[in-house]
Amino acid sequence: MREIVHIQAGQCGNQIGAKFWEVISDEHGIDPTGSYHGESDLQLERINVYYNEATGGKYVPRAVLVDLEPGTMDSVRAGPFGQIFRPDNFVFGQTGAGNNWAKGHYTEGAELIDSVLDVVRKEAESCDCLQGFQIAHSLGGGTGSGMGTLLISKIREEYPDRMMCTFSVVPSPKVSDTVVEPYNATLSVHQLVENADEVMCIDNEALYDISFRTLKLTTPTYGDLNHLVSAVMSGITCCLRFPGQLNSDLRKLAVNLIPFPRLHFFLVGFAPLTSRGSVGYRSLTVPELTQQMFDAKNMMAASDPRHGRYLTASAMFRGRMSTKEVDEQMLNVQNKNSSYFVEWIPNNIKSSVCDIPPKGLKMAVTFIGNSTAIQELFKRVSEQFTAMFRRKAFLHWYTGEGMDEMEFTEAESNMNDLVSEYQQYQDATIDDEEGGEEEEGGAEEEARQRKHYVIDYVPSVCVILIR
């Protein structure tokens, strides 16, 4: 089996994670005690992806729950599925990270990291064929961002060839939970660029908009928002868990979505999203799902795909449908909106079809897009970071934990590089003489052509000139 070990870090990660396990357990017919009460063999066929079978036919999630303070853990334990988790897999400190990335990454988090890695190792050892890890965390706080990224880099050292997929809640443009969010997020992105394989970017503001405008919820709670995130999380792995006509997994996803190693930050979406009142008035068809899936209002991060171009995208359909129709719709979307797709990657939408729809729906689709528009998100954080860092505001909280200003400067320039890489590929055309090199100036390009010129015409002089 292709197992996935799930890790949730910090308050946000644990709340998303708790909701995710409710959704997944429901799909597989597992009740809050871990017993199976489903009605189809398909629910059990590949249940090992996310669950361990324990004695007495109980199913235990392959989940590791991490936090630097006990509060959220207690709420997860007291929640609807709190008793399903293995008690040893709750790893928590007492002090908290106080929204400070340095505490999570270097001091408090570093003290707890070995206990977490022991639990992760135990989970990985109980797998037949571990496919990878998925981590739910936020980038704005202290634990999820600081300790979450520390955990990612440690796991990457120990399991370099396994997939590392993160569901990262990024700071919202208008709604801010903490003042030092831009610092924490920039330092985290600096780590994620190097150590993660796939980063699904989610932000609360976009989730609020979806709940408010599309789902018509007047006062959406975090529970409602987390439900949206878990719909995407379950959609990404449904092909691993249920039989399908066209399968996909974390590695196939990465191979099809990431044209250049650093550009692995994705926009995610889900369809159908309709308010309870209007469910009866809409038909669920593949064209309808496709149209909604590419709608900017459906994106779970505040980046508008119309402001950039898709390098690649992936659509994971669920339910009984014809693969021919799926292929036609994908082609149709690309032909009609060709200006929003880069022309130097032909057929850049990957699709997969899984036969089992989510609970309560006839068909659904999960969308993952690698769009250059995601640079808006990084630009926003970067501007806020620069404004504070120029005045060295709040810096003493970080340097007090042993951090160096240099690390901030490096993180800032890494993020700015990322933005300009996205911009570069957004502007690139099929005829560009890019040669695949990333940071190549015009002068170097000219010099290179001159070299070719010499090689072509005067082979004997060539050696002298190049030296």
Swiss-Prot record:
Compositional bias, Acidic residues, is annotated for 429-444
PROSITE patterns, A to Z: TUBULIN (PS00227), TUBULIN_B_AUTOREG (PS00228)
Q: Which GO terms describe its molecular function?
A: GTP binding; GTPase activity; metal ion binding; structural constituent of cytoskeleton
Q: Which SMART domains does the record cross-reference, listed alphabetically?
A: Tubulin, Tubulin_C
Q: Which SUPFAM superfamilies match?
A: Tubulin C-terminal domain-like, Tubulin nucleotide-binding domain-like
Residues annotated as binding Mg(2+) are E69
Gene3D superfamilies assigned: Helix hairpin bin, Tubulin/FtsZ, C-terminal domain, Tubulin/FtsZ, GTPase domain
Q: Where is this region: Disordered?
A: 429-448
> Per the UniProt entry, what is one GO biological process?
microtubule-based process
Q: Which cofactor does it need?
A: Mg(2+)
Where in or outside the cell is it found? Cytoplasm, Cytoskeleton, Spindle; Nucleus
Task: Mention any one GO cellular component term assigned to this protein in its UniProt record.
Answer: cytoplasm
Q: Which residues bind GTP?
A: Q11, E69, S138, G142, T143, G144, N204, N226
Ordered alphabetically, the record's keywords are: Cytoplasm, Cytoskeleton, GTP-binding, Magnesium, Metal-binding, Microtubule, Nucleotide-binding, Nucleus
Q: Which domain of life is it from?
A: Eukaryota
Q: Which residues form a coiled coil?
A: none
> Which family would the database say this protein is a member of?
Belongs to the tubulin family.
Name the job this protein performs. Answer: Tubulin is the major constituent of microtubules, a cylinder consisting of laterally associated linear protofilaments composed of alpha- and beta-tubulin heterodimers. Microtubules grow by the addition of GTP-tubulin dimers to the microtubule end, where a stabilizing cap forms. Below the cap, tubulin dimers are in GDP-bound state, owing to GTPase activity of alpha-tubulin.
Name under which the protein is recorded = Tubulin beta-1 chain
Organism expressing this protein natively: Physarum polycephalum
